[in-house]
UniProtKB/Swiss-Prot annotation:
Subunit structure: Homodimer.
Function per UniProt: Allows intracellular utilization of 4-hydroxyproline, one of the major constituents of host collagen, by converting trans-4-hydroxy-L-proline (t4LHyp) to cis-4-hydroxy-D-proline (c4DHyp), which can be further metabolized by intracellular 4-hydroxy-D-proline oxidases. Strong B-cell mitogen. Plays an important role in the regulation of intra- and extracellular amino acid pools, allowing the bacterium to profit from host precursors and enzymatic pathways. Displays no proline racemase activity.
Family designation: Belongs to the proline racemase family.
Catalytic function, reaction form: trans-4-hydroxy-L-proline = cis-4-hydroxy-D-proline
UniProt entry tagged with the keyword Isomerase: yes
Keywords: Isomerase
UniProt activity-regulation remark: Inhibited by iodoacetate, iodoacetamide and by high amounts (10 mM) of pyrrole-2-carboxylic acid (PYC). Not inhibited by PYC at 1 mM.
Organism: Brucella suis biovar 1 (strain 1330)
Pfam family, any one: Pro_racemase
UniProt enzyme class: isomerase
Molecular function as annotated in GO: 4-hydroxyproline epimerase activity
Name listed for the protein in its UniProt record: 4-hydroxyproline 2-epimerase
Length: 333
């Protein structure tokens, strides 16, 4: 029997939780972060479930573990953990991780105000604004994002046939826009969106294939992005992003905002240099920007950036005790 101890720094990014594991993370094998992610999932996924699920976490919990970089052009490597698994990339998680890592002295950037992250999805460039000991704002330049498919149709409970576009922004997103059987996210409750989303995701994954053309391990649709008209006077659009089994992102979602910008750019509604301010279900904002045009395996793409803020909420030393029947966590359906 053993008691495993993890020192965590807890916080949130624009309302969505981030738990940064600053001590106790396992040593991982692999020459890339994608390989280290695979090792973690094969042997240490109990750490993720123990720290993210109840009774130590909750349905919306999201986190990260810091590692030495696997590539010379990066300052630090990040493994993202949450209730839905180990995401290749997480935008809100990046903003929270960078904020807390800088404020707590866990990372020393080679160049003050800039940081290169080694993630399973690739290099993510960071610029941050610091006022004394506090990080006020983080802008991440994400991996290339692209529109993957248009007009895919499946049956949605209660609503009927629904058409979605699928875009990649670090994860694959099904984007649900207003149409005959769906009006606006504001016309439905969060509980309805949570009930419909896993069915929609499952049916899309069963009917269609989703495969990143350059990253073989990214091969499924993981998120549903419900769209709506903005309420905030600065915002261009509003969203509710579903992830995991029953979670709605409280932030505007960084990789989701990247995917949305890629979709809009592919349809001629955004161009390099344009800004896109995205509002979350609770009214917080991410400031997106199309940095430049790009290409992914011959597909037109964009390089998006996302800016947002995070706040630290406290320190947490968490035990995963083998004597505990719920050591590896649980989720109530």
């Amino acid at each position: 029997m053993a008691r495993h101890s993890f020192f965590c720094v807890d916080g949130h990014t624009c309302g969505n939780p981030v738990r940064l594991v600053a001590g106790g993370g396992p040593n991982l094998n692999g020459s890339t972060m994608m390989e280290k992610r695979a090792h973690f999932l094969a042997e240490y996924d109990w750490i993720r479930t123990g720290l993210m699920f109840e009774p130590r976490g909750h349905d919306m919990m999201s986190g990260s573990i810091l590692y030495p970089p696997t590539r010379p052009d990066c300052d630090v490597a990040v493994l993202f953990i949450e209730t839905s698994g180990c995401l290749p990339m997480c935008g809100h998680g990046t903003i929270g991780t960078v904020t807390m890592a800088i404020e707590q002295g866990l990372v020393t950037p080679k160049t003050p105000g800039k940081l290169n992250l080694d993630t399973p999805a690739g290099l993510v460039a960071i610029e941050y604004e610091q006022d004394g000991q506090y990080v006020e704002r983080v802008r991440l330049t994400n991996v290339p994002a692209f529109l993957y498919a248009e007009g895919l149709e499946v049956e949605c409970p209660d609503l009927g046939p629904i058409k979605v576009d699928v875009a990649y922004g670090g994860n694959f997103y099904a984007i649900v826009e207003p149409q005959e059987n769906y009006t606006d996210m504001d016309d439905y409750s969060a509980l309805q969106l949570i009930a419909w989303s896993p069915v929609l995701r499952q049916r899309l994954n069963e009917k269609y294939k989703f495969q990143h053309p350059e990253l073989p391990d990214i091969n499924r649709l993981s998120h549903i992005l419900w769209t709506g008209k903005p309420k905030h006077p600065q915002a261009h659009a509003r969203n509710a992003v579903f992830y995991g089994d029953k979670a709605i992102d409280r932030s505007p979602c960084g990789t989701g905002t990247s995917a949305r910008m890629a979709q809009l750019a592919a349809k001629g509604k955004l161009k390099p240099g344009d800004e896109f301010i995205h509002e979350s279900i609770i009214g917080s904002l991410f400031h997106g920007r199309v940095e430049r045009a790009a290409e992914v395996a011959g597909r037109p793409a964009i390089v998006p950036s996302i800016a947002g803020w995070a706040r630290m909420t406290g320190y947490n030393t968490i035990f995963i005790d083998d004597r505990d029947p719920f050591a590896h966590g649980f989720s109530v359906a």
